[in-house]
Every structure is written in C-alpha cells, then in structure tokens.
C-alpha cells in the first residue's frame, strides 16, 4: 500500500448558484427567487463562463499529463459537467460521494440578510471561527477534513499506490484537503482563509506530488504543490491558465516556545 504519486484536484467551473451568491454579496437579492432557493444543491449546472473555464483548465491539464490512472468526480451536476467539458482523453470517471460539496445545511441558498436575522449567533461564529464553524445542520471545514478527506486518502492509499489521480470536486473540499495534506495549524489555515492569494476560484487546480519537480526524487508523503487557475484576459476575451511556482511543504514540528 502507498499513496498516489500525483493528485490533481480541480474545483468545478462557475455554477448558476455561484452567480446568485455573488450577486447577493453585492446587495442584489433579486435572484433569490422561490424557484432558485428550492433547487437542490446537487442540481446546479455550469454557466457559459463555467464551461469556458472547464475547457481552459482541461486543455492545460492535457498538456501536463495526457492520461491518468484514476479519474474521480463528485456526483453533483456541476462537477460532472466540468469533468465532461475538460475532455480528458480516454477518461473513465468514477463518481464518489466523498468528493461532494460541503453541506451548508439550513443556510444553503438564502440571503445574507436572512442568515443574519434568523441565525444571529451562528452568523457571528462564521466570521470569527471559519475553521470550526458549522452552518446550522451543516459541516465545518474541520468536519470535512477529519471525515471525508481522511476516508478518501485511506482509500487512495489502499488502491492507488504510485498512480496519477485526477479529481473534480468543490472549493471547500479542496481547502479541507489542503488542511490535511499540508498538516496546517489552525493559525496558518486562518491566515490563508483571509488571503486573496489562497482563494480557490472556479476551476483552480491544486497538484500535489510525491516527486520533487526539480530532481525527480520521490518521497513516501506528498511534499510539493503547484497551483494553476484559469484567468480571463478582458482585453481579448480569451481564457488562459496562470501557473504558480512549485511550493515545498513539510509537517510542522513545534518547540515549547512555538506552542
């Protein structure tokens, strides 16, 4: 048994729900209609922009690694549409519920005003404790990390030793994977949660590897990560992929003074 050599984890493209929520964040609640707020979270589809993002990251991914050993996808419509639009050659996708969206419970697709007025204390905790905060009847980031991410990694350790794996999932699941694979402290997670550079935008790809990208040596644990994300050139209307440098990380060990 052993871990995969490479894991490419991709967030779905822009969805219909993303558009509604973004509008609400700017004070426009006109899209929170009765028809929209009763749509099950699993049923939201990609927008035209989301399909362009998926096509863009798919073409980049093929240029990096044309074929994978294992293809995993969340069963939600927006992730399945993203995976299909990426058009990876010879892909054989396995749907797995472990990759599903974090549960937002009772506040899924409600306005910020409704959230604040109906769940005032919970609304405060969302801002002050984003790692352990749970939406009413929902999941925290820590819940997803300790349960579903660990289940996924255990399964991959049993079934996918030294393989290359591609997964299409959701933003908060990817945050939970980052938390787990990089053994982030609570403080480091909170720092990243507040930083623009760590945002997992639609169709962002986090590539984790056990192979040193500079020397080719391999380790038993994931030790390197590279981020890629689709970026729209507003002048030309074209989508291109912005690729960051590789990051090396290791499990932090703390002294008494550090604690």
List the predicted regions and their residue ranges.
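GST superfamily/GST-like fold recognition
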Residues: 171-175
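Beta-strand elements within well-structured catalytic alpha/beta cores of enzymes
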Residues: 6-10, 72, 163-169
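Acidic, low-complexity terminal tails and accessory targeting/binding regions
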Residues: 1-10, 16, 20, 25, ...
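Glycine-rich phosphate-binding loop signature in dinucleotide/nucleotide-binding domains
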Residues: 64-67, 156-163
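Phosphate-coordination/substrate-recognition cap region in phosphate-metabolizing enzymes
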Residues: 4-8, 15-17, 22, 48, ...
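A solvent-exposed, charged loop/short amphipathic helix patch at secondary-structure junctions
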Residues: 23-40
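Short glycine/proline- and acidic residue-enriched helix-loop micro-motifs
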Residues: 36-45, 123-141, 248
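Internal catalytic-core helix/loop-beta-alpha segment
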Residues: 133-157
